[in-house]
């Protein structure tokens, strides 16, 4: 059975809100990315800084902020799938989400609805927060809220006589009353096919506006039926469940889809027109946006059809009621902004116009399909956050939006010269009202303040070399040698690009050196310059000094202790002194290594920490000593008096940190944020204790750290009566991590190699909260994974400035880096693909790393990468000087040459021509054309990411699939060659039968063009055939290849003369969507009827149907999942489910395998676009190769599906059950319901579901006591096995880095 | 093993014996045909029976005419059908019309093999060796090739997979117009004299060397 693991978090911002959710003082944005809820704060530099992030168990479909009684903070109403509403507030004590109430509507909706429900409901909140509605298809739920005290008073006035306020409060102390659930027709019997439903402003009772169409019509039957769209305003009496129709409008255009309530009226948005309806319900004006707009509407019509705007349903709007008028901005799917100007005198509309906002700086060049907009905006200035499906979410500053009005005004002025209107609009606040020259005004300005990284929608992926193209860098082996990355195509339109996902940091190598053997190095900076490099070899008891600026010449320092092991090296006293700590004592030198002082210690020193002027060291017996440099002459060591209690404690390590974490407990510093020196120690029983410079024998401790509790707090240390030393904490660090905005973190490194992090609470000083967001497993406790920590010692190093980032490095056989971007949580990544023994800072912001084979490299962080997601992401933009390629669709990697093949699709105007090139009957050249496509192939060299060859297909063609595969060219020799197989189809109108094309290409080496050394490969076309039927999928099968042409699966064989001859075929029910092969077994997915499992045999050629799925999935993608000699299939369908089926001829009800056994179904929160099989890395034991499936999705996330053996599955299942039973789900999102509840639940085995690693990984972050409870339930010695299983999941993609 | 194109053909499935028994189907499509199996006598003719790792070609594949019902997915006789259930265009006979006329009226849809006899011409040996005296008038195919520089210097690690040509040293056949001359045929006394004369002329300054 399998586990589902998300390896890349979603990046598409699908909903954002502006308001105070966690802090009343700071401007905050609440952002939802599928299932990740983040709160960003606006920093002083106008950047978005992440304050909190929670990963929920389900998708956030919609959310709204609601006021909270008695608190300046707002609460959140979250709508999730299955029409569930959670009311959530921020809990300032635990700094987490607190669920206030949960409302489930799905079951009731199913009972009441007469048709099948939509997957996503609509939520709307009353502007006065009296109630909230959830609507789906034809059913409606109204949830009365008790949030607004003023509103309650109004209510009381109205209903006061019948029901006194006090009584009502007693009856229900909560914030909500009972929900009312009903079919929409019970509001009014004519209501049917509702398009939009919104609460309206300015009514004393909750009132809704409904846009609906009782008789469905479209442009095909419009002439017969006419305009059938209707609009109705209904006032609701929630108490008595009565409704009153306030206004009704009929015969509206059929393309209306959205209703926007304004302060004094409503705007109805249609694809081709905008309508204005007054508050009393009279249609007052209409703007024609293009030539398709309806002409049969009886109102004042403004003709803007030359603007050629199409406002499809995916366009979004931003509305804000300003003092004098309404601000309504529409953003269409191509990210053009329009300002809708409405002016009215009383109820009479005086002006209704649509103006395009003049954006000159092409800020939205790479953005398409906006999803959500929020912010604070007025005519002068303002900031908005816009989330896009394609392109980074943008945090924008808008200045002088009024110019958008003014530009139009000038135009009006020339027509009817009427500036009274203008002054009425802007009033006195407008200084230059009477100056008629537009140039004197400040121009409209839109600028980007910050952006949230987005790589969605991911359309296809492949595995290929990106950073490992060059085998050597600076004459040393590439630190990422033989490493493969995942390369995906992302985005739509002009913002489309490639994304490379690195599982390790791939640094820039500035300098590379061959080294003598060294176990540790130090770089001594004198006057801001790298001066001396000190190396030591612990095995040979040797130390050396080299001069960096003199080409690493050995420095003849006579006083320097060369014959012993150096423990620590540091410059002191403003770089005037150099201190060397050897295993035998302390030595103080001046800058030329002349000895000034010496202090010999009898017992061997094992660890030292030097922070000017203090020297802390521990000896082999576990004693601690602190010395201080004499403050006058800086030539003497003075012993620092330790608290007495310290002598009785067993100490394992000690360091000095600067922090203000315990200022609250220090006399005179209660309110100061000044950083203090903290002498910090880890005791034998894993307590962290510390004291300050003026300690007065007072020691503090971090309570709860020994059990790794969720929250640590500072208290005075009491020596325990009994102490059982069982050290597990190896090293701790307390320092600031981040980029521009740094935050304080406590990093704990254990002997087992695990990394735990705690973040300092921003609200309560002296409290630390555990970081639980998507961890990377680096080790395991109780010696469960000794392979991780042996060979090379793991030591954490802190670098305050590594390319601007404050980071922690951890050396070892597998080195790690802990890095934090401002708009993300702390992330742990693997640092390069080589072991790192030691490191030292280098230059201004680099690091020198020494590996186990004595190579030293100066590494710099790749600035093009983004380190804020769970994998390192790099955007690669494919550009040609002359033209843009727009959407990049498919990608394949040609292994023999190391080249990438990418398909592009450009939008062109569709010419409705018949087969002989004549315009079709009814073709109107005056109207705008529909969109057609033109596509082609690009050959990309990953060295420079330049296009080195291209192949353009004809107009209206669309590449559907590209694969590279090993094809047998000669049936006798069976020599295989890697060829590129491309399937495409022609997109034409529905009267013509679909046709497609099959292309077989080879990539050949040619002599590079002069000046372009990367252009040494070219496409060579081997075979091309036009095919009746669209070629949707191509797939390798035992040296031949299968193409899916519409409903026929055809296996073709390459002949010696490079022609591809059909050798076998199989008919599929409707339309082949995807096909995959494993050995000579194949699965072919159908768009309507599930999929078929087929065996292929050659000479005689046969395609034997071995099994079929019994459910009629609408297959999107499928993949094999092979484990322990069994075959499973994973299928994703159009409803965003992921099904696991199995070929089990032994099973009783499988009709000897002909029915594929349905194992389980799993909900994904977004559409899967592509799946690929990858060999699994085996960390423990068995040599048999297993495979995992990788999939990429529309919301920018990538998942992997990992098969498990029976024993690990059972262990995990128990752990998942335990965790789900005992942990309170965040925001009321129940994992089981969100992931497993679907219509297929009863078909599978309910006790053997696909597991969710998001739940399993919570185990890692449980406090030790809770972990032990779970382990005991799972079985004896379960701890080691559980950690092995977890590591096995985590490392399953290491096959990319250790490919050989 | 390649991570980009994982080799899955060696994987052993638990259900393989079942497939062999039920469909006489095994996981390597290019496995050899069983020498013992006789399709008329059935499974008993092979000593390994259903467990035989080699191919047992069913009697249905001895037929020559493709079943028209099977082509439409309607044949109910399955393996017992007296017609052929295989759609292999490699085995189609040559299109008579095309061979005769050089084109076919059914062109894209014609199911018969369209063999372009020009492409089946032999490669011209002389041309491959460097020069064909007949030039364009040669009846054989002249295929332009790029010499592999690695091969020319001595060794090409790619071997057969190399994109460029690896010409072999070949003694021209008797029919070829090219001959390898023996040394004495080339170094005649007449030529020596001529060379000496030219050398002397250069030394004497009669001919200017440019």
Curated annotation (Swiss-Prot), chain A:
<keyword id="KW-0507">mRNA processing</keyword>
<dbReference type="InterPro" id="IPR050358">
    <property type="entry name" value="RSE1/DDB1/CFT1/CPSF1"/>
</dbReference>
<protein>
    <recommendedName>
        <fullName>Protein CFT1</fullName>
    </recommendedName>
</protein>
<dbReference type="InterPro" id="IPR018846">
    <property type="entry name" value="Beta-prop_RSE1/DDB1/CPSF1_1st"/>
</dbReference>
<dbReference type="GO" id="GO:0006397">
    <property type="term" value="P:mRNA processing"/>
</dbReference>
<keyword id="KW-0694">RNA-binding</keyword>
<dbReference type="Pfam" id="PF10433">
    <property type="entry name" value="Beta-prop_RSE1_1st"/>
</dbReference>
<comment type="function">
    <text>RNA-binding component of the cleavage and polyadenylation factor (CPF) complex, which plays a key role in polyadenylation-dependent pre-mRNA 3'-end formation and cooperates with cleavage factors including the CFIA complex and NAB4/CFIB. Involved in poly(A) site recognition. May be involved in coupling transcription termination and mRNA 3'-end formation.</text>
</comment>
<dbReference type="InterPro" id="IPR015943">
    <property type="entry name" value="WD40/YVTN_repeat-like_dom_sf"/>
</dbReference>
<comment type="similarity">
    <text>Belongs to the CFT1 family.</text>
</comment>
<dbReference type="GO" id="GO:0003723">
    <property type="term" value="F:RNA binding"/>
</dbReference>
<dbReference type="Pfam" id="PF03178">
    <property type="entry name" value="CPSF_A"/>
</dbReference>
<keyword id="KW-0539">Nucleus</keyword>
<dbReference type="GO" id="GO:0005634">
    <property type="term" value="C:nucleus"/>
</dbReference>
<dbReference type="InterPro" id="IPR004871">
    <property type="entry name" value="Cleavage/polyA-sp_fac_asu_C"/>
</dbReference>
Swiss-Prot record, chain B:
<dbReference type="GO" id="GO:0008270">
    <property type="term" value="F:zinc ion binding"/>
</dbReference>
<keyword id="KW-0479">Metal-binding</keyword>
<dbReference type="InterPro" id="IPR045348">
    <property type="entry name" value="CPSF4/Yth1"/>
</dbReference>
<feature type="zinc finger region" description="C3H1-type 1">
    <location>
        <begin position="28"/>
        <end position="59"/>
    </location>
</feature>
<feature type="zinc finger region" description="C3H1-type 2">
    <location>
        <begin position="61"/>
        <end position="88"/>
    </location>
</feature>
<keyword id="KW-0862">Zinc</keyword>
<protein>
    <recommendedName>
        <fullName>mRNA 3'-end-processing protein YTH1</fullName>
    </recommendedName>
</protein>
<dbReference type="InterPro" id="IPR000571">
    <property type="entry name" value="Znf_CCCH"/>
</dbReference>
<keyword id="KW-0507">mRNA processing</keyword>
<comment type="function">
    <text>Component of the cleavage factor I (CF I) involved in pre-mRNA 3'-end processing.</text>
</comment>
<dbReference type="Pfam" id="PF00642">
    <property type="entry name" value="zf-CCCH"/>
</dbReference>
<keyword id="KW-0863">Zinc-finger</keyword>
<dbReference type="GO" id="GO:0005634">
    <property type="term" value="C:nucleus"/>
</dbReference>
<feature type="zinc finger region" description="C3H1-type 3">
    <location>
        <begin position="89"/>
        <end position="117"/>
    </location>
</feature>
<dbReference type="Pfam" id="PF14608">
    <property type="entry name" value="zf-CCCH_2"/>
</dbReference>
<dbReference type="GO" id="GO:0003723">
    <property type="term" value="F:RNA binding"/>
</dbReference>
<feature type="zinc finger region" description="C3H1-type 5">
    <location>
        <begin position="143"/>
        <end position="169"/>
    </location>
</feature>
<keyword id="KW-0677">Repeat</keyword>
<dbReference type="InterPro" id="IPR036855">
    <property type="entry name" value="Znf_CCCH_sf"/>
</dbReference>
<keyword id="KW-0539">Nucleus</keyword>
<comment type="similarity">
    <text>Belongs to the CPSF4/YTH1 family.</text>
</comment>
<feature type="zinc finger region" description="C3H1-type 4">
    <location>
        <begin position="118"/>
        <end position="142"/>
    </location>
</feature>
């Amino acid at each position: 059975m399998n586990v589902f693991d998300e390896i890349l978090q979603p990046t598409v911002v699908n909903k954002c809100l502006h308001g105070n959710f966690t802090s009343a003082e700071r401007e905050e944005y609440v952002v939802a990315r599928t299932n990740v809820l983040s709160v960003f704060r606006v920093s002083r530099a106008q950047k978005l800084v992440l304050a909190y992030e929670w990963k929920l168990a389900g998708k956030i479909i919609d959310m709204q902020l609601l006021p909270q009684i008695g608190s300046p903070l707002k609460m959140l109403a979250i709508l999730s799938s299955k029409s569930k509403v959670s009311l959530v507030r921020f809990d300032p004590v635990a700094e987490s989400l607190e669920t206030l109430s949960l409302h489930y509507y799905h079951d009731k909706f199913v009972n009441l609805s007469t048709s099948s429900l939509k997957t996503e409901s609509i939520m709307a909140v009353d502007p006065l927060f009296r109630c909230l509605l959830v609507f789906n298809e034809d059913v409606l739920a109204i949830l009365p809220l008790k949030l607004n005290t003023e509103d309650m008073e109004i209510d009381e006035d109205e209903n006061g006589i019948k029901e006194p306020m006090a009584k009502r409060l007693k009856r229900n102390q909560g914030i909500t009353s009972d929900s009312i659930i009903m079919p929409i027709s019970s509001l009014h019997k004519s209501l049917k096919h509702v398009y939009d439903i919104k609460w309206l402003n300015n009514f004393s009772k909750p009132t809704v506006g409904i846009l609906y169409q009782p008789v469905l019509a479209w442009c095909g039957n419009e002439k017969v039926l006419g305009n059938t769209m209707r609009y109705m305003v209904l006032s609701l009496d929630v108490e008595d469940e009565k409704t009153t129709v306030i206004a009704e409008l009929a015969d509206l255009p059929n393309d209306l889809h959205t209703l926007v309530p304004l302060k004094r009226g409503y705007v109805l948005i249609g694809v081709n027109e905008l309508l204005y309806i007054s508050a009393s319900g009279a249609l007052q004006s209409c703007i024609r946006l293009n030539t398709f707009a309806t002409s049969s509407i009886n109102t004042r019509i403004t003709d803007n059809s030359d603007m050629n705007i199409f406002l499809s349903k995916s366009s979004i709007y931003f509305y804000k009621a300003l003092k004098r008028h309404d601000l309504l901005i529409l953003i269409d799917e191509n990210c053009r902004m329009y300002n809708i100007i409405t002016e009215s005198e009383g109820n009479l509309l005086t002006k209704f116009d649509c103006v395009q906002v003049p954006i000159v700086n092409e800020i939205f060049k790479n953005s398409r399909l906006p999803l959500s907009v929020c912010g604070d905006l007025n005519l002068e200035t303002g900031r908005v956050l816009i989330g896009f499906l394609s392109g980074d979410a943008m945090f924008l500053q808008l200045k002088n939006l009024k110019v958008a009005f003014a530009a139009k005004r000038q135009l009006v002025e020339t027509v009817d010269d009427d500036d009274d209107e203008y002054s009425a609009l802007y009033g006195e606040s407008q200084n230059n009202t009477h100056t008629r020259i537009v140039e004197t005004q400040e121009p409209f300005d839109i600028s980007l303040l910050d952006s949230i990284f987005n790589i969605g929608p991911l359309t296809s992926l492949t595995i290929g070399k990106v950073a490992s193209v060059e085998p050597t860098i600076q004459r040393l082996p590439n630190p990422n040698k033989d490493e493969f990355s995942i390369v995906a195509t992302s985005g739509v339109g002009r913002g489309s690009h490639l994304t490379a996902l690195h599982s390790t940091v791939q640094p820039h190598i500035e300098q590379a050196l061959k080294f003598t053997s060294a176990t540790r190095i130090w770089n001594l900076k004198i006057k801001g310059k790298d001066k001396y490099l000190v190396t030591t070899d612990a095995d040979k008891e040797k130390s050396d000094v080299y001069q960096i600026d003199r080409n690493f010449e050995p420095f003849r320092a006579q006083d320097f202790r060369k014959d012993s092991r150096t423990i620590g090296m540091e410059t002191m006293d403003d770089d005037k002194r150099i201190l060397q700590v050897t295993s035998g004592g302390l030595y103080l030198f001046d800058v030329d290594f002349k000895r000034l002082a010496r202090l010999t210690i009898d017992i061997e020193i094992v660890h030292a920490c030097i922070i000017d002027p203090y020297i802390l060291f521990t000896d082999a017996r576990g004693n601690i000593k602190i010395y201080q440099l004499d403050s006058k002459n800086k030539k003497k060591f003075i012993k620092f008096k330790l608290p007495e209690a310290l002598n009785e404690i067993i100490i394992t390590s000690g360091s000095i940190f600067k922090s203000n974490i315990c200022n609250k407990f220090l006399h005179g510093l209660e309110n100061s944020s000044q950083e203090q020196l903290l002498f910090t120690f880890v005791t034998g029983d894993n307590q962290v204790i510390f004291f300050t410079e003026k300690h007065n024998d007072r020691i503090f401790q971090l309570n709860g750290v020994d059990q790794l509790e969720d929250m640590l707090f500072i208290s005075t240390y009491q020596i325990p009566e009994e102490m059982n030393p069982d050290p597990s904490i190896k090293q701790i660090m307390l320092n600031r991590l981040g980029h521009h905005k740094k935050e304080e973190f406590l990093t704990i490194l254990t002997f087992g190699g695990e990394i735990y992090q705690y973040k300092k609470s921003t609200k309560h000083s002296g409290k630390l909260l555990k970081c639980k967001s998507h961890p990377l497993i680096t080790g395991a406790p109780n010696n469960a994974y000794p392979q991780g920590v042996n060979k090379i010692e793991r030591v954490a190093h802190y670098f305050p400035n590594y390319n601007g980032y404050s980071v922690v490095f951890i050396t070892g056989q597998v080195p790690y880096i802990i890095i934090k971007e401002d708009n993300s949580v702390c992330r742990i990544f693997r640092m390069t693909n080589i072991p790192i023994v030691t490191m030292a800072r280098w230059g201004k912001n680099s690091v020198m790393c020494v590996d186990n084979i004595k190579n030293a490299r100066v590494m710099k962080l790749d600035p093009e990468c983004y380190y804020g997601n769970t994998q390192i992401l790099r955007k690669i933009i494919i550009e040609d000087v002359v033209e843009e390629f727009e959407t990049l669709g498919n990608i394949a990697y040609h292994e023999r040459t190391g080249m990438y093949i990418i398909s592009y699709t450009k939008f062109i105007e569709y010419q409705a021509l018949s087969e002989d090139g004549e315009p079709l009957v009814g073709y109107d050249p005056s109207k705008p054309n529909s969109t057609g496509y033109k596509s082609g192939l690009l050959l990309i060299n990953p060295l420079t990411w330049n296009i080195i060859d291209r192949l353009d297909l004809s107009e209206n063609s669309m590449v559907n699939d590209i694969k590279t595969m090993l094809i047998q060219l000669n049936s006798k020799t069976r020599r295989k060659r890697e060829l590129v197989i491309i399937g495409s189809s022609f997109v034409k109108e529905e009267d013509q039968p679909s046709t497609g094309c099959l292309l077989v290409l080879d990539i050949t080496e040619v002599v590079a063009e002069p000046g372009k050394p990367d252009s040494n490969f070219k496409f060579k076309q081997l075979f091309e055939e036009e095919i009746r039927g669209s070629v949707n999928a191509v797939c390798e099968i035992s040296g031949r290849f299968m193409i899916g042409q519409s409903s026929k699966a055809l296996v073709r064989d390459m002949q010696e003369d490079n022609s591809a001859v059909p050798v076998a075929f199989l008919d599929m029910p409707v339309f082949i969507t995807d096909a995959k092969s494993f050995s000579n077994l194949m699965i072919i997915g159908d768009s309507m009827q599930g999929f078929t499992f087929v065996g292929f045999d050659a000479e005689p050629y046969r395609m034997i149907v071995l099994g079929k799925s019994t459910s009629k999935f609408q297959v999107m993608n499928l993949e094999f999942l092979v484990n322990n000699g069994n075959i499973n299939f994973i299928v994703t369908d159009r409803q965003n489910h992921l099904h696991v089926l199995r070929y089990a001829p032994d099973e009783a009800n499988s009709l000897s395998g002909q029915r594929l056994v349905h194992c389980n179904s799993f909900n994904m929160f977004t559409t899967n676009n592509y799946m690929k099989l990858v060999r699994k890395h085996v960390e423990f034991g068995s040599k048999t190769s297993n495979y995992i499936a990788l999939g990429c999705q529309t919301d920018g996330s990538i998942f992997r599906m990992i098969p498990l053996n029976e024993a690990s599955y059972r262990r995990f299942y128990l752990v998942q059950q335990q965790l789900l039973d005992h942990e309170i789900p965040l925001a009321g999102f129940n994992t089981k319901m969100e992931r497993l509840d679907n219509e297929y639940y009863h078909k599978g085995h309910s006790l053997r579901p696909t597991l969710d690693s998001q739940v399993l990984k919570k185990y890692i972050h449980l406090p030790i006591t809770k972990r032990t409870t779970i382990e005991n339930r799972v079985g004896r010695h379960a701890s080691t096995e559980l950690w092995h299983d977890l590591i096995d999941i985590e490392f399953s993609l290491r096959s990319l880095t250790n490919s050989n | 093993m390649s991570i980009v194109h994982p080799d899955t053909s060696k994987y052993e499935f638990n259900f393989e014996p079942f497939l062999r028994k039920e469909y006489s189907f095994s996981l390597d499509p290019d496995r050899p045909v069983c020498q013992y199996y006789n399709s008329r006598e059935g499974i008993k003719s092979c000593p390994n029976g259903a467990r035989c790792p080699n191919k047992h070609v069913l009697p249905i594949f001895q037929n020559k005419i493709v079943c028209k019902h099977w082509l439409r997915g309607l044949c109910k006789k399955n393996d017992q059908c007296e017609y052929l259930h295989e759609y292999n265009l490699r085995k189609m006979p040559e299109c008579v019309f095309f061979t005769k006329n050089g084109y076919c009226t059914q062109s894209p849809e014609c199911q018969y093999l369209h063999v372009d006899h020009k492409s089946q011409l032999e490669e011209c040996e002389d041309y491959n060796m460097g020069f064909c005296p007949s030039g364009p008038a040669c009846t054989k195919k002249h295929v332009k090739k790029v010499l592999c520089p690695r091969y020319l210097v001595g060794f090409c690690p790619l071997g057969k997979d190399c994109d460029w040509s690896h010409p072999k040293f070949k003694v021209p056949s008797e029919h070829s117009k090219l001959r390898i001359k023996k040394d004495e045929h080339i170094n005649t006394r007449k030529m020596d004299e001529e060379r000496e004369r030219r050398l002397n002329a250069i030394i004497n300054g009669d001919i200017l060397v440019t």
